[in-house]
């Protein structure tokens, strides 16, 4: 890790653009997207399972949130989250009750979730009409964070607390 910081410092040498608040903000935005997905995969790997359905769930939850959240973004986000919970619950019950491999069950889940997304969208790109939601979620605060990255950090903190005290 120290070596990587030294190399990055040499790359930045005097320009001042690489090690900047803007770069940290950009990295945090990327973390806000990929961090929770990686956390879910990592937690499943801790219990010697592997969840291949994550990418299918991300696309389905996003589509559900966009398709149902035009009038009320909170409702869309809640329904997208609920879809993820229901999907995970179904796959978890199948694995535990039928004693099946997580790879097989979640691969089937991935294909099923992608199929549902395909049907919901008609294989078309869906867009969200209200850009003020995106602007609000991505607006910087404290020069380093956005609402999205703060939520991702909170999810990591919650996972750490659950792992520590359960």
Residue spans of the language-model regions?
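Generic alpha-helical transmembrane segments of integral inner-membrane proteins
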Residues: 2-10, 36-40, 60, 78-90, ...
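A generic hydrophobic-helix recognition signal that picks specific residues
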Residues: 42-44, 81, 141
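Transmembrane helix-bundle core of multi-pass membrane transporters
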Residues: 98, 102-166
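Alpha-helical transmembrane segments within multi-pass membrane transporters and channels
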Residues: 72-110
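Single transmembrane alpha-helix segments in multi-pass membrane proteins
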Residues: 3-14, 18-73, 93-100
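Hydrophobic alpha-helical transmembrane segments
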Residues: 27, 35, 56-57, 74-82, ...
């Amino acid at each position: 890790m120290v070596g990587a910081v030294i190399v990055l410092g040499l790359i930045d040498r005097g320009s001042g653009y690489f090690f900047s608040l803007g770069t940290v903000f950009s990295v945090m935005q990327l973390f806000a997207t990929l961090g929770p997905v990686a956390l879910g995969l990592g937690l499943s790997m801790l219990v010697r399972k592997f969840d291949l359905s994550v990418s299918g769930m991300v696309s389905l939850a996003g589509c559900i949130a966009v398709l149902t959240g035009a009038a009320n973004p909170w409702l869309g986000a809640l329904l997208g989250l609920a879809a993820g919970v229901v999907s995970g619950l179904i796959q978890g019950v199948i694995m535990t009750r039928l004693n099946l491999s997580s790879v097989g069950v979640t691969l089937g889940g991935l294909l099923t979730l992608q199929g549902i997304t395909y049907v919901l969208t008609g294989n078309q790109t869906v867009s969200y009409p209200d850009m003020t939601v995106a602007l609000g979620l991505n607006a910087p605060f404290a020069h380093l964070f956005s609402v999205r990255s703060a939520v991702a950090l909170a999810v990591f903190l919650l996972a750490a607390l659950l792992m520590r005290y359960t």
